[in-house]
């Protein structure tokens, strides 16, 4: 789980992968009982077709909550992308990067776990986002992104077809 840095609508919110497969937003009044998690409705791109997850707490921007994500694609390649969630209703995805922001470069592909770049968070520095990241579970790197360029690389998400949606209530998965 990754907590949002402030309450929204009087409630605490957190990013989760409660079902082990889907990025979702859960909320609670007391930080102890997280009953409902709402899956984030976005289609899956090729670079994240095997697995998706979040990469640390959201960053609050005037435009929305910026969420770094990781995706696993062909050859178990881990890449980093981003979502933009509505400020007042963080279960609504208002933007996403179609292409990853960061992928393993040729000189970063060998290591304990090959083909992996992964982060557990980021830091906003004015108009930039500093992203520390692990490389192949063997090295560490830092990337700096212009927030404006991340937002410009986003487009509105397309919802997944209804047959692929799943809703989880109190730990039970219910398919449409």
Where do the protein language model's features map onto the residues?
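Beta-rich carbohydrate-recognition and catalytic domains
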Residues: 1-50, 59-113, 126-176
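Electrostatic interaction modules used in gene-expression and signaling proteins
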Residues: 122-124
């Amino acid at each position: 789980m990754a907590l949002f840095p402030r309450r929204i609508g009087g409630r605490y919110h957190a990013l989760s992968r409660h079902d082990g497969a889907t990025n979702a937003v859960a909320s609670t009044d007391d930080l102890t009982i997280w009953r409902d998690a709402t899956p984030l409705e976005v289609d899956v791109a090729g670079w994240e077709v095997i697995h998706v997850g979040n990469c640390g707490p959201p960053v609050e921007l005037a435009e929305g909550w910026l969420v770094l994500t990781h995706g696993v694609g062909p050859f178990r390649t881990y890449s980093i992308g981003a979502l933009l969630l509505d400020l007042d209703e963080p279960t609504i995805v208002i933007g996403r990067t179609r292409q990853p922001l960061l992928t393993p470069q040729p000189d970063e592909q060998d290591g304990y776990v090959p083909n992996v770049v992964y982060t557990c968070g980021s830091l906003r520095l004015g108009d930039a986002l500093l992203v520390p990241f692990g490389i192949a579970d063997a090295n560490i790197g830092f990337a700096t992104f212009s927030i404006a360029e991340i937002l410009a690389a986003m487009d509105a998400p397309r919802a997944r077809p209804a047959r692929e949606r799943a809703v989880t209530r109190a730990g039970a998965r219910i398919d449409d």
